[in-house]
Amino acid sequence: QKERGLSSGFLASKGEKFRDEMMVQRKVTDEHAKVLSEAIKQQDSYLPATVKKSLAEATAFMAEVDARRSGISNQVLSPADTFAWFTRAIELNLAATSQVTPTLSQADMMRRFNVYVSFLSTKEQAGQERATLNAVLGADLPLDSTLLRRLSSILASQDTYLTNFRVMATPSEGEAL
């Protein structure tokens, strides 16, 4: 999420802003991806086939991250395309996470996992909001109608996921938010 936002701001500013932060975030993203990859390898024998399939799809999609980063650094990609690519990568990972729910046998665990997925989805919408606003601030221009529509849609989705979280969460889970 952070790399998406910084990349959007970098491209929108025509490379004038966010370069250093973006480069640092790429390293952080790579470190997190390595930890995730190791965890998946360690748990592979325990993962249901549906989860493995979703994780494989997300991993295959991320195989082009270096080419995307090069296009961003060289400013040959648009902020909109970059936003869409990172958003799809995140969606694929969230889909893999969501695949765990049907494999759970206890109703309370299913509910808790659905609460968790709603929280992650709310967080993702907040990340999209930040990336959109970062592009606006990076460009140093007024919010155009396309970005305004995107922002409105993001805020509506964020509100829906947050409502789902609050409906399913216990009082203590809700307070933790």
Residues covered by each model-derived region:
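Hydrophobic alpha-helical segments
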Residues: 1-177
